[in-house]
Amino acid sequence: MSNQAALKLVGKEDGDKQRALEAALAQIDRAFGKGSVMKLGEKGKVEMESISTGSLGLDIALGIGGLPKGRVIEIYGPESSGKTTLALHVVAECQKAGGTAAFVDAEHALDPGYAFKLGVNLDNLLVSQPDNGEQALEITDTLVRSGAVDIVVIDSVAALTPKAEIEGEMGDSLPGLQARLMSQALRKLTASINKANTIVIFINQIRHKIGVMYGSPETTTGGNALKFYASVRLDIRRTGSIKNRDEIVGNNVRVKVVKNKVAPPFREVEFDIMYGEGISKLGEIIDLGVKAGIIDKAGSWFSYNSQRIGQGRDNVREFLKVNKDLAAEIEAAVRKSSQKIEEELLVGGPEDGDDE
């Protein structure tokens, strides 16, 4: 009763309200731990921690220099668009910064050789190949709650098959089972993800809705829960092929930030993914350098500081591969011009209504 008495307002004076608020906060701190409730501006502006995506352009497009820590991220797109490649680049960047990464391989399709080529330290990568969706999400929950893992990648949502479906007959109809599993798991995971400051990346596939006449017929698997819980949603698409004479050596890729709770969304960036190499950093430096006006492009010729550095983008890339100091100088100039580039990357809003 004494606690209730302390909280009771005896008048409408500001002093009485302030004392009542302080008593309430003290009671909450005793019950749930210090810092359970705090004033947002109490410690000044808190900078959002992030981990680089491995793509300079995407880091700029995200507005905070990478993917935000302590948040749920969704990377989705068609088959062979670069979803897993992008996720592995984030893992590599996390490890370079001294972090611990885990990969929940629900598809049982992780290629260790390819991951190594992208810069992933295989000796320190935690890998799980679960038998069903419940097991995959329980493993994720345990890793996050440990507070010792900086990033968990789940590849993919479509492969998180509920146990009831695996144990049932091949033709059994079990509508909404996976959606309920995802909804329940995300309700449980979200608070611990934020508390542990862990990034959890869900890789997702695209399906087509039947009979849609208006709007986009595309949707992602696993129901709507992930769309709501994700702080960042990245739509990745292959836009073309990179050829060396008749041989295809890579893909042109476009990534659109369709949802961003930590910075302005709807920014779009393009980069190259080279086979056996991953995201082409030099290709990005050239493209972003041109966007920022750091590199001059006249016809097929590229110039930096009034000196020609090559004819054709591929030749410039080879030139910068040899001249690493010059490449580093241009990259530093691009990073300084990130605000100008951000404005260049802004595109229209969502094309359909399922991004909340």
UniProtKB/Swiss-Prot annotation:
Cross-referenced PROSITE patterns: RECA_1, RECA_2, RECA_3
SMART domains cross-referenced by the UniProt entry: AAA
KW GTP-binding (keyword) present: no
Annotated SUPFAM superfamilies: P-loop containing nucleoside triphosphate hydrolases, RecA protein, C-terminal domain
A GO term, aspect molecular function: damaged DNA binding
Location (main, coarse): cytoplasm
Source organism superkingdom: Bacteria
Binding site for ATP: 77-84
GO biological process: DNA recombination; DNA repair; SOS response
Protein location: Cytoplasm
Swiss-Prot/TrEMBL keywords: ATP-binding, Cytoplasm, DNA damage, DNA recombination, DNA repair, DNA-binding, Nucleotide-binding, SOS response
Role summary: Can catalyze the hydrolysis of ATP in the presence of single-stranded DNA, the ATP-dependent uptake of single-stranded DNA by duplex DNA, and the ATP-dependent hybridization of homologous single-stranded DNAs. It interacts with LexA causing its activation and leading to its autocatalytic cleavage.
Protein family membership: Belongs to the RecA family.
Protein name from the UniProt record: Protein RecA
